[in-house]
Amino acid sequence: MTRRQLQCYQGQDEKNMISDMKKRFLNICLFFPVLFFTHYKPVLSGVYDWKQPATTATKNINTSVMFEGNAFEMEWLQMTANILIASDKKTTVTIPANEEHLYIVKKGTLNVWKADSSYSLSQGSILVLFPGDVLPIQNTQTNACEFFVMKYRSNPFPDSERAKNAGGSIIKNWNNVEFKPHDRGGVRTFLERPTAMLKRLEMHVTTLNAGLKSHAPHTHAAKEIIVMMEGDTEMLVGKKTFKGKEGSVYFLESNILHGITNVGTTPCTYFAIQFE
């Protein structure tokens, strides 16, 4: 039987199968460039200093990237320095459906509106915004408002039900968080709870007296970010030592040895953020 005769006997199902295989192959070829361009290198443990954004008259929010990459189960993690200029107009922030954003006010006052409530968030206040959140923000003060934004995507899909059951988006005003003094300084406990992207997000603020260590060098499974609000510190990270000041951010990967010391002459204050 000739090749032409064989083709005549080929069933319709077989033809459909070959057509499907061609379509799948084409989709794979189209998908590979997406994989290439969305691949991020791991964020390296160490210190990243505040990068003052250049302000422009055409933008209310001006941003510079401090670090960006992946971090184990975090497909993408980015920390930015931001300035919101004074304006009589609100700026609407929309969180993408596959991201969460964590705001920390570094300087000034950030006005936000959520549902039927309005908030004036002073230095040290935080926002945790979930996928799909939309809210207006504004700076009505004379000076610019500076704030950190940590954006992240987890490898598993967002769990909106988990976030809803945990209480939804988070707004915490610094002035409403109790300070509990201890022999090394004191602590403010902000939160510990799951989110849409994370099984656990824990945040507290440590005030550490001059010349003291917060803890002996230690490790833990959760990744940790230290955001310096004031003072001068030194952080042991693995076998290296890094120095941080106001606006610096330490990134600590899972299970890396670390320990922070206040090397200044006055108390230092910093956020400690663990997530997994």
Q: Where in this protein do the model-derived segments appear?
A:
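Bacterial Sec-dependent N-terminal signal peptides
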Residues: 1, 8-13, 17-47
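Ligand-binding loop in jelly-roll beta-barrel domains
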Residues: 132-156, 254-276
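Histidine-centered metal-chelating micro-motifs
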Residues: 89-92, 96, 111, 127, ...
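Short acidic-glycine-tyrosine-enriched beta hairpin
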Residues: 116-131, 239-254
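A short, N-terminal "cap"/entry segment at the start of jelly-roll beta-barrel domains
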Residues: 39-78, 86, 91-92, 142, ...
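Conserved short histidine dyad/triad with adjacent acidic residue
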Residues: 78-96, 204-219
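Short, conserved beta-strand element in jelly-roll/cupin
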Residues: 95-111, 205-208, 219-234
